[in-house]
Amino acid sequence: MGSLNIQHNGYDADVEKIREEEYPMLKDSIYLDHAGTTPYPKSLMDRFAQEMTTNLFGNPHSASASSQLSTQRIQDIRLRALQFFNADPADFDLVFVANATAGIKLVVEAMRCLPTGFDYVYHQSSHTSLVGVREEARSSVCLDTRQVEDWLSGSCPFDDNEDEERPILFAYPAQSNMDGRRFPLSWSSQICRQSLSPTNKRKTYTLLDAAALVSSSPLDLSNAETAPDFVVLSFYKIFGFPDLGALIVRKEVQDVFLSRRYFGGGTVDMVVCLKEQWHAPKDGFLHERLEDGTLPIHSIIALDVAMDVHAKLFGSMERVAGHTGFLARRLYQGLKGLRHANDELVCAIYSPDPETEESGPLVAFNIRNAQGIWISLAEVEKLATLKGIHIRTGGVCNPGGIASALGLEPWEMKQNFSSGFRCGTDNDTMGGKPTGIIRVSLGAMSTIADVDRFVQFVKEFYCEDTPPILPPPETKLDPSLRNTPELFIKSIVVYPIKSCAGFHVPPGIDWEVRPEGLVWDREWCLVHRGSGQALSQKRYPRMALLRPNLDFTKGELQVTFAGDISSSPGLPSSISVPLSKNPKMYAPKKSGMSSRVCGEEITPQTYASAQINDFFSTVLGVPCVLARFPPGGQGKGMTRHAKAHLQRHQHQQPHPAVSVSTRLTKPAMMPGAFPSPKAVETPPSPPDSDTERSATPTQEAQGPKPRRILLSNESPILAITSTSVDALNQSIALLNPSVSQPISEAVFRANLVLSPSPSTPSASPSNPLTPSPSPSTTSKPTPKPKQKPKQKLNPYEEDTWSSLTIFNSSSFSSSSSSCSTPSSSGFQTTTKFQMLGSCRRCHMVCIDQTTGSKTAGGEPFVTLSKTRRFEGKVFFGVHMGLQAEDEEDGHAEDIEKEGTGMGMGTGTGTGTGTRSMGGNGSVVKVRVGDVVRPSYL
């Protein structure tokens, strides 16, 4: 073993030397997704560019000198590619295709045209592209390894009454792209012998998916008698470039393709169209009949260069296989050795042990915390991305392998689908089981440092090296000690355009709240012209530099770009759109495009103005259009609903001033409320709010309606506390001292920032474009309620809130109320909000909202992942929405009912109004400085 380590350390040292020069794109990155594709070296691209600039390559279907040069080079490269796999051109032909999947489709296209069709057998570890073949077969069956061995021993996977003339196609991977498990190449020879047996009347063909195997190991086709009939592979998995694949066909079975019906340009000698329909396929080499249209000339030329450079840099494929195998063993043992403080394994590994079973250089696994709860795949990938680690997570296009490894029965997979699971979504744990895996795969240019750094990454963020803290014993506290903290609204921020900068509501201004959220919040979005996807800062961080201003005097949304536009002379630095819903501003509905927000399809109103759309496209450098999703929409694509819900960790963290028994027995509901007099609308509100549409009798009978939202991700309103932000910054200073600047509250993009200290709003707004409030709303300070000694607000205490009550001191008027003006005792309205659950975070919090660039050290997400991860997900802040009238929780005792204008009863008494969503004639408003009182779960 010592000499083996020395040998591989020598290879590793060689790779380290060339990586800086040959793979500059790998600087500061740990690339561990070679099973997807491998990086290409710089010298390959340089030499290919030289080939293209010094030679003239023409269409090989012509007779010119340039065309003949192309034909000659293609013939030479085809032979060289066969020799790369030790395939004798006398026994094999190679057909150039786009990728392995295209090769599979070519085989299936021929098999389905056979007079009897074909039956299909495939291994459960097959790639999705092999699984899809079953849809073209007369019948199909999926077998695991034991069942394949039984079949090869004589048992037939099909009924005896099947057509004896119908051939069977057996497909399997040489190496699983999911867990790296390798399957015997001898299966092909066994199938061949069985097919030739006198007792077997059915011809069986073999299709080998070698794409995963050849990426790091040699494939030997020197024995044509035992080789598979068809082999498919992708060259980019070996060399990184070009994007090209191959179908290698054993010439003995090439007659299968005689039944293929389709023909393309260059594959026929004669075609008759008029009066008769007849054609004569080329009768020379098989590839001449199968390579439809013009070949990808330049990609084939690049393949020649790629084989040269690969051999120069890494030597033989046997040498690559030895190195990657060594790294795979190191990776497997490193992950296997990680344990929590309670001795539970950190990683559940699905790949075979490379020390005892032949497997490829990849490891498939999932991560559990010390309590055995699965860590979210999406959270792992988010954190890996921040650390410059490139891995693959999810189903990895291997449904059978995933189902087998994770113990997912068909009914469970169908149930997951019905519950909303889709490929590429964040629903990675359903029904207590993961829906995918983490895949780490190695390649020729991988190093020991790559492996060690990844193992250290898992250890640092997911290995719990201290025993879990046991919950405190149950104790019942004296009711007099159950005080709630008094909080204040420190700031109110609306984000008119989804994922762009926020508009800070000036002090002294009342801001309307509707069931769908703060008025004007996330009513617009930018939509990619091609994909229809709503743009997000996660992909386009420069969106943070688009600064909105709501100018109610002019009735405009003004957007200024705070970045550099010097490269676009003549481009204005700002643009304006009217707040009114002027139909002339929008593109005709027939050309309106649908969009997707958080996986949901919506039908926004897109703006027709080229000036508006060009402004956003230019400053962001992405083709996009401005679209609006106003409240009040009806029908498919016009409504969205909140998805936030209480998380399990919120039920497990009692408020410090509430006993465990009290917390568990108190229902998480709010007391009822009645409508307050309608407020003066300052600032103006958009029309057609959801509050203006009453529920139908059918809806009322079905119970509370789901909460409607506009373009926010999960809920109407997002809130954070300054106390939690301060605590997080203290944690960052402790865990990541290299970060010199504290994290701003702005990175969390909250609508409400709550603070235990009252703000000191100025007498008038600092924004001259915002209307000045009336004297009655600015001169009268918010009255402070009489209360018992204040309870200190602890960091992250918001996780334990069931509801919030906000005391607003605005002036209200209503013809139906005697309380048309504030009373001398200090008229206040109380607005109730229900807490909808903790906010799950992604690495978008790592974008500096001032500069549009990434924050230092991947903060705050890196520290959040260490201090705020529950059940594998990272949380910070809380979702909330207006309390519905039917959501009563009996928490009135937590809010004092003394004669202070802040009573939480029925609203009777001195100058008290209690409001919730949907009240007729009421308008809910909040302002900076309002008093906030929480109730607890």
From Swiss-Prot:
Domain MOSC, first and last residues per copy: 682-935
Residue numbers spanned by region Disordered: 633-710, 756-795, 897-921
Gene Ontology biological-process annotations: Mo-molybdopterin cofactor biosynthetic process; molybdopterin cofactor metabolic process
Pathway: Cofactor biosynthesis; molybdopterin biosynthesis
Pfam families in UniProt: Aminotran_5, MOSC, MOSC_N
Residues recorded with modification N6-(pyridoxal phosphate)lysine: 237
Organism superkingdom: Eukaryota
Known cofactor(s): pyridoxal 5'-phosphate
Molecular function, one GO term: molybdenum cofactor sulfurtransferase activity
Descriptive protein name: Molybdenum cofactor sulfurase
